[in-house]
Amino acid sequence: MRPYYITTAIAYPNAAPHIGHAYEYIATDAIARFKRLDGLDVRFLTGTDEHGLKVAQAAEAAGVPTAQLARRNSGVFQRMQEALHISFDRFIRTTDADHYKAAKEIWRRMDAAGDIYLGTYSGWYSVRDERFFVDSETKLLDNGIRVAVETGTLVTWTEKEQTYFFRLSAYVDKLLAHYDANPDFIGPEVRRNEVISFVSGGLEDFSISRTSFDWGVQVPEHPDHVMYVWIDALTNYLTGAGFPDTDSELFGRYWPANLHMIGKDIIRFHAVYWPAFLMSAGIELPRRIFAHGFLHNHGEKMSKSVGNIVDPMALVQTFGVDQVRYFLLREIPFGQDGNYSEEAIITRMNTDLANEFGNLAQRSLSMVAKNLGGVVPEPSEFTSADTALLTTADGLLERVRGNFDGQAMNLALEAIWLMLGEANKYFSSQQPWILRKSESEADQARFRTVLYTTCEVVRIAALLVQPVMPESAGKMLDLLGQEEDQRAFTAVSVRLAPGTVLPPPTGVFPRYQPSEIEGADPVKSSSKRREHNKRRE
């Protein structure tokens, strides 16, 4: 099988995970699952970035050892991913022993290339961004606080700290040449243009070590320095592929990575610094870096100060994991900023899932159970209406594959639901409930053909939504009598076998019932109900 290596960004475990983390994990997982179902040998890496000043300060504020806080919070991130059905192959932590070896080796390689030198640094540093800023990149607010212009985060002055620098200035032409030769290296297009513009303006050497704290990977031969967190963090992608053992089967098979999935706020680290590090170290660059957008809550940016940060686990407990996965990938054009609201989730659940998909499956399968002994019927000759619908369904895989390759999962789901919309119109226009009552053998044959055609397109839809809704799609395929070896995408072209015995039909996508408290926030109401039930227990 052809290998495919896909990664998420690794999260700082300095605080609880939020809906933005879940969004990236779900999207990346959907692609990983799609590739597996499409016959590829997938390696899926995710994890946490446990080093850096941000984590150290969070531990100090909590009054616990830094390693303890990092370990505890990393566990929270891993459990959330498991609850979201994220099918990772490895959950890496940057405190893992093999990662220390990888980080030290890439440093040695960059040093051997002459790209690391010792100097002193004075300037502004953002703990939240784990990033340095020159004076022109900051501004002083009316309240006397200085912030980074780009991110709006607080910056503090670092005074003449001894540090190692990386010769980023030497890589301007090499980076621009790579972008030009590999137009798909950065996506979406707006981020590619942003990066090219940034690099074209020239690059400055930047600090890659710290001596003012010790929570990180020590610099080889210089233990008084710890690596700048981004060298350490970015190297996790290599660690996950077996580096520094470049002769290993793992590294030979999976590196370079096919896709780094990240948020747009860290595009420079991944599309400028990371390829420069790899060029310096003599390591092949990843194939593609894609930066998704941010989620807003009812049109507002989420922040702790506003109090509108969404807990993904509360959403899952209220609406269901597959429902949340579907909403996030269907509602928002991937790569753009998007809006989250409880009302929008409920609309998708009731309109798309319960009505368009669930109701079509339930009606057709119930008719098979009631009138045909729960056995897939033998169709008679197909009419033009049957053929048109089946042709649309048959063509979905190629279209959806192209959408997933371009990280356009919303378009893939849109295409599937357009077909389901046509299937619902077909079912209504063919009126199988009337055909069923006819004593004409021709009408009975037509009845069986309509049900067969409907069940077949439901099967194809269920196959194709597996990456997004694995549990629900699995239940739908169970109802259609499909065994585990009939669920890869190769099965799309193999027609549903007449004579297949089906289990009694059950609903897969129930409608969401509004909260008992009219106008209440369903997530908060659900949380209150859970607390009430706990007290009763």
From Swiss-Prot:
InterPro entries in UniProt: aa-tRNA-synth_I_CS (IPR001412), Anticodon_Met (IPR041872), Met-tRNA_synth (IPR014758), Met-tRNA_synth_2 (IPR023457), Methionyl/Leucyl_tRNA_Synth (IPR015413), MetRS_core (IPR033911), Rossmann-like_a/b/a_fold (IPR014729), tRNAsynth_Ia_anticodon-bd (IPR009080)
PROSITE patterns: AA_TRNA_LIGASE_I
One Gene Ontology term of the molecular function aspect: ATP binding
EC number in record: 6.1.1.10
Chain positions covered by the region annotation Disordered: 503-537
Chain ranges for the short sequence motif 'HIGH' region as given in the UniProt record: 11-21
Highest taxon of source: Bacteria
Compartments (UniProt record): Cytoplasm
Binding site for ATP: K304
Alphabetized UniProt keyword annotations: Aminoacyl-tRNA synthetase, ATP-binding, Cytoplasm, Ligase, Nucleotide-binding, Protein biosynthesis
The protein's assembly and partners: Monomer.
The protein's role, per its UniProt record: Is required not only for elongation of protein synthesis but also for the initiation of all mRNA translation through initiator tRNA(fMet) aminoacylation.
Protein name listed in UniProt: Methionine--tRNA ligase
The gene coding this protein: metG
